Every structure is written in structure tokens, then in C-alpha cells.
Amino acid sequence: MNYNQPATLQAAILDWAGTVVDFGSFAPTQIFVEAFAEFGVQVSLEEARGPMGMGKWDHIRTLCDIPAIAERYRAVFGRLPSDDDVTAIYERFMPLQIEKIAEHSALIPGALQAIAELRGMGLKIGSCSGYPAVVMEKVVALAETNGYVADHVVATDEVPNGRPWPAQALANVIALGIDDVAACVKVDDTWPGILEGRRAGMWTVALTCSGNALGLTYEQYQALPAAELERERTRIEQMFEGSRPHYLIETIAELPAVVRDINARLARGEMPQGN
């Protein structure tokens, strides 16, 4: 049997918060701030957004490794935060996250239409998240009431290593029966999610405006003056440079056009690993 390069995409693997739901990715960021505050440690929204896309325990560990936050922790507890301390914060974070996830569960404008168009082009819809399974159960149920059902969902604690490792994306490939990683496109609003797709050998699409990096509500995004939006886009594109996304678009509403372009590139023999 000979190897044949894929001629078209077979699946889109979509992130959740900031990509399909929760414009601005507010649900996780605000809860990180609140969880640290319950331990007497101040963390700003901007700081909380930094590692977004990682699994939530890893996210908290990364925050605790930031020198300024570590020093604030030392000022309260007289020591630097250990893994046990990270687990304690995580265990406070989880019930807060489950309790408040519904407050930021609205679908991103244009998401349903874009996903329907992808299905019309023959793509399966996989998905993964930095949320653990106990949170994803609620996120998935809320999305279903709004009309969105992915073909497969992989939570961060359902694989040995979460983002930026490729395990969640590859778990989707296996579950969806995709025969080539180059026939997949990974869509995410964070650099760990783009690295995940890159390391899995997939096409990657970074979202510059709907998610964590811009950090605004849809209404605030719509109201931004053109010059300010352009400055923000430039800043966010620079933030993504290290993860090397194949495409950058503002929101998932623009994804069908990207899929058509990728299909044209595949038909010409191009592969994601070579770009």
C-alpha cells in the first residue's frame, strides 16, 4: 500500500472558551483571580490570562512560578508555593469554576453558522479544552442547549499531558477515525492550543479577537475604534509568532474561508508540516 497525501480536510478540532463559546474567555480568567484571592494572594486579570490554554492545574503552577506572584505568596505564607499549594488552589478553583461557568456560556456570534458550513464541506468536528472533564460536562450541556454539539470532546485530564503537548488533538484524530493528521485543522485562541496543533502535525488557525488575547466582550470588540483594533491585532499577532499558526483570523466566523483555502493547498500537494 502506498502513502497518498490527503486531498481535503477531514476534521476541524476546535477549542471551546474563546473559540466557540465565551467571547473574551472570561469564565476561567476571573475564577483564577478569585481562587488566588481566597488564599490572600492578588493576581490581576492580565496575569491570569498569560498561560491560558494550558490545563488548569498547570496554569496555576505557571502562575505560581511567576516571580512577582511567588513573592506575593511568600509574603502571605512565608514560603514559595509548592505543588501541594498549587493543588490546594486548584481544589478551590474547581468548585468556583463549575458554579460560575454558566455565566459565560453564550456561543460566539457566527459560530453555529461557521460550523454548519464546515459540516457541509464534509468535516467532522472534534474539540478539546483546558478544562477538566467535570467542567466540560457542564460546558458541553450548556452548548447543546444553544445548538452546538461537537462530534467528540477531549478534556485536559483525559490525556497524560495537556497543551501544549499534542495529546488532546491526537485523541480526537483517533476517536473521529481520521486517517492523516494533515487532514485536520486545529483552531484556538491561545498559543498553547496552537502549539498543540503544530506538534500534532495539523494545520493551525489562531483567533486574534474572540478569545483570551484581546480579552473583551463581543460588544466591546465591536465598539473598538479601527485604529485601536489594528494596534491590538498587531500585538496579538506578535504574541502568536512563536507558535507559528498557519492562519490568523479574528473569529470563528471567518473559518470556512480558511478551510476552503487549506483544501486548495492540499489539492496542490502542500502539507502543514512544510509551512
From Swiss-Prot:
Gene3D superfamilies membership: HAD superfamily/HAD-like, Putative phosphatase, domain 2
Q: What induces it?
A: By 2-aminoethylphosphonic acid.
* Reported cofactor(s): Mg(2+)
Broad class of enzyme this protein falls into = hydrolase
This enzyme catalyses: phosphonoacetaldehyde + H2O = acetaldehyde + phosphate + H(+)
CC annotations in GO: cytosol
Q: Which residues cross the membrane?
A: none
Fetch the InterPro entries from UniProt. HAD-like_hydrolase_sf, HAD-like_sf, HAD-SF_hydro_IA, HAD_sf, PGP-like_dom2, Phosphonoacetald_hydro
The annotated modulation of its activity is: Inhibited by phosphite, moderately inhibited by phosphonic acids, the corresponding aminophosphonic acids activate the enzyme.
User: So which domain of life are we looking at?
Assistant: Bacteria
BP GO annotations: DNA repair; organic phosphonate catabolic process
Annotated residues that bind Mg(2+) are located at 15, 17, 189
- E.C. no: 3.11.1.1
The active-site annotation reads 15 (nucleophile), 56 (schiff-base intermediate with substrate)
Q: Name one GO molecular function term.
A: magnesium ion binding
Cofactor note as given: Binds 1 Mg(2+) ion per subunit.
Q: Spell out the Pfam families in the cross-references.
A: Hydrolase
PANTHER family recorded for this chain? PHOSPHOGLYCOLATE PHOSPHATASE, PHOSPHONOACETALDEHYDE HYDROLASE
Q: Which HAMAP family does this one have? A: PhnX
Give the UniProt family note: Belongs to the HAD-like hydrolase superfamily. PhnX family.
Note the subunit structure. Answer: Homodimer.
Per the entry, what this protein does is:
Involved in phosphonate degradation.
Name of the protein described by the UniProt record = Phosphonoacetaldehyde hydrolase
Q: Which organism is it from?
A: Pseudomonas aeruginosa (strain ATCC 15692 / DSM 22644 / CIP 104116 / JCM 14847 / LMG 12228 / 1C / PRS 101 / PAO1)
